[in-house]
Amino acid sequence: MGESPDFISDLPQSIIENILTRLSIRDAIRTSVLSSKWRYKWSTLTDLVFDEKCVSPSNDRCVVETNLVRFITGVLLLHQGPIHKFQLSTSFKQCRPDIDQWLLFLSRNGIKELVLKLGEGEFRVPACLFNCLKLTCLELCHCEFDPPQYFKGFSYLKSLNLHQILVAPEVIESLISGCPLLEFLSLSYFDSLVLSISAPNLMYLYLDGEFKDIFLENTPKLVAISVSMYMHEDVTDFEQSSDYNLVKFLGGVPLLEKLVGYIYFTKYLSIGDDPGRLPLTYIHLKTIELYQVCFEDADEVLVLLRLVTHSPNLKELKVSASPVQPFPLEEEGFDLFERDYFDYKLPSLESVKITDASGIRYELEFIRFLLGTSPVLETVTVSSSLSDKDAKMDMVIELLRYPRVSPRAQLLFLQD
């Protein structure tokens, strides 16, 4: 009998490459035993992803770390051709001197995507990283870096993600402005940072940290913004500016489609002298999510009103009330909804979700406003933070009394 055909060895190169790219690097290397033709097929992979699962588990972390270093070094030594992506996720610290050598190797191999997710403690990024001028994506976690003076930026970088990075504020700003093609920017766990962002092609912005101030100086193409902003309990330092933060932060983003804000973000937007109407109508804005809004603060409620009334195509609104009570409501603030807001129409609003409602005046008035100005509204979902059943029932009865301009509008009450 003749030998059966060796289908594995005779697979087209494109199919072999497709198979290898779907495997972990460890399993890809194991394909070397399939046949002599497969022995070094893995060595031309352009995307290399490493983590602690690349080596056999052991109760001795030192053994695992040593094996991981040897594994990565061996892969790089045997690799042939360009490396487009290199990703390392590890909590080990002793391998950090080896990372310097790996980055030097990568800087000479046309690396385009670099991801370093390291454990606690800052890893000082070597200068050779800034020689990786073909980078299109850079993600660093628990690192420290200070670019050399000759560094002018990454001309091709489109995505920048920095998580818990030790770096001077001016370095961040210089890095961002030195990436003219940047489309995605994420900065998280930054403390006491005054940040100016100039990125003419930026489309997606995610910020998480204790920012003192944020300036969007040149971001005309932004379509999505998400900000988690933390402040000290004493916010007097943030009350000094006469510029209205809502205008300062959102005054130059005409293409905005989605806005999400957490913690003190609405408070931050409310600071400064309100100019009246906003200078910009957000015709593309379809989703607004603002969490932990203090409905006892008339200025924060005004931010909500300003945003929804200047977003004619808004479809979805999510708001959570702040569980804290920072100060009593001033009586003169009660005329907020007696202005001309009920002359507005929200022609596209379909879905509203209010969470952690406690039934205070401004919460109820805001819901009444939405019901009375949204002709295509379908659902208003309300969940309450009240523990007293009678108080909760009073709130429900009050809300059911409000007129609705949409014949399809439904009020749904959920138990927290």
Swiss-Prot record:
Presence of the UniProt keyword Transmembrane helix in the record: no
Listed SMART domains: FBD
CDD domains: F-box_AtFBL13-like
UniProt repeat feature LRR, residue ranges: 115-142, 164-189, 203-229, 238-263, 294-321
Keywords associated with the record: Leucine-rich repeat, Repeat
Domain of life from the UniProt record: Eukaryota
Residue ranges constituting the FBD domain according to the UniProt record: 346-384
Residue span, F-box domain: 5-53
SUPFAM superfamilies: F-box domain, RNI-like
Name of the protein this chain belongs to: F-box/FBD/LRR-repeat protein At1g13570
Organism the protein comes from: Arabidopsis thaliana
Taxonomy of the source species: Eukaryota, Viridiplantae, Streptophyta, Embryophyta, Tracheophyta
